Amino acid sequence: MNLRKVWGSMWNRSNSCKDSTKAIQVLPRSCSSSISVFDQLPMDILVQIMMLMEPRDAVKLSLTCKALKRLVGCNRIWIFYLQCLQESWDSIFFAETSLRCGYPLRMVSSESEELSFMRVYGQRAQVPDSIIIDGGSGFCKFGRSKNDSPSRRVTIFREFGRIESPIYARLQQFFETIFNRMQQVKPSMQPIVVSLPLCHHDDTESAKASRRQLKTAILNVLFDMNVPAVCAVNQAKLFHSLSAFLRFRAVFFSAVLALYAARQTSGIVVNIGFQVITVVPILHGKVMRQMQENNITLSLHAVLTLKECYVALDYEAELSRDAQASMEIAGTLSKQRFFQTGEILFQPRLAGMRAMGLQQAVALCMDHCDAAGLTGDGSWFKTVVLAGGSACLPGLAERLEKELHDYLPSSICNGVRVIPPPYGVDTVWHGAKLISNLSTFPATCN
């Protein structure tokens, strides 16, 4: 019916262009005498007709004959359908070409002919709605994977204390609170994607034991809540099923999720969290712990409080300016205090702390990555992705990039770029959303 409706408006244009446009025979006469006039219709027009249909109607049309089946299977049509979805096409394309094969990552050919987007569309439509829980060190964001953003947030440090401390009762209260605040959600009905808090990053045996202890405690709590499937996001490492009801697979470090949200598979993630700054090198989705820079511990309560803070591109030049601004926080603060608060990240001594600055920690990490010589081109670590609430300070990405270019030798600094948090404070949550909506996600998490 749709074909007949469109045909009337297309036929005259097709006749007028007959001499200049070569007709392409795509339908055999045996298909149907009522649509035999389409035999001489150019391919581009047929594709445009298909795009006017609903995806389900296009699939039904493909059952008519082999020629229509080949036409409906055209990637161009299904790329159009995917572009009409709420999710960004760039994110969909990145996920389906870079992440669909699981770990270790294997890039699908950039020429999309090897990937059937008709199959991708159908598989994505069948992916169940998951609950994503991003348990950061300061705040927790949670919501459904089909939504555009987290539905709720809770302040972990106020309500639950140090959530990474693997105490069963505390974790049980944490997850029960989340499910109680999400209306019409039962733990036993939907898969869960968990991004574990950034903690115990070192490559020491004690840190490894702490990570295992935390994961075991979380699994035990969710198991007792009858969760059907858990895709726990922490390390790039697979775990075997613990039972027929609770499966613990496709495990990623939360820094990897921030990298995926920026549509990258290799680079350095700088997470500026509630109290700890971590510099995490990642190669093809795997955390390179042996090259990871030690954590920088700073108290960022002031940065979290002063929402008008920013980072000056040139600190000395900004100091010399006589501009003033004010805000009400136990009195009046000058604009100088606004950017001086952010300057602590680069000059911790301003706050009386003995620690290396952010630019020094990132540069040292890059130097370790360069010396390791893991890849031929040596550029995998030159993309820096910022994550964490305090990383959203205006001017931070530009300042860090400038400092790195000034601090690093020319052999390394060429090509270095710093990407601000792609989704602000929700960057890690969106990285988990990218994975949970993958066409291959059910196979990964079952």
Regions from the PLM with identified roles:
Residues 1-41, 48, 80-120:
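CRL adaptor-proximal regions
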Residues 41-53, 64-72:
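Short hydrophobic alpha-helical "box" of cullin-RING ligase substrate receptors
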Residues 77, 120-219, 288-291:
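Conserved phosphate-binding loops in N-terminal lobes of ATP-dependent enzymes
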Residues 112-125, 223-270, 431-433:
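Conserved phosphate-binding catalytic cores of ATP/NTP-utilizing and phosphoryl-transfer enzymes
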Residues 174-182, 344-380, 399:
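Phosphate/ATP-binding catalytic cores across multiple sugar-kinase/actin-like superfamilies
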Residues 189, 283-355, 382-383:
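Phosphate-binding glycine-rich/basic clefts of nucleotide- and phosphate-handling proteins
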Residues 228, 232-235, 254, 401-433:
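Conserved phosphate-binding/catalytic loops in two-lobed NTP-binding clefts
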Residues 239-243, 258-260, 299, 355, ...:
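Glycine-rich phosphate-binding/hydrolytic loop that grips phosphoryl groups
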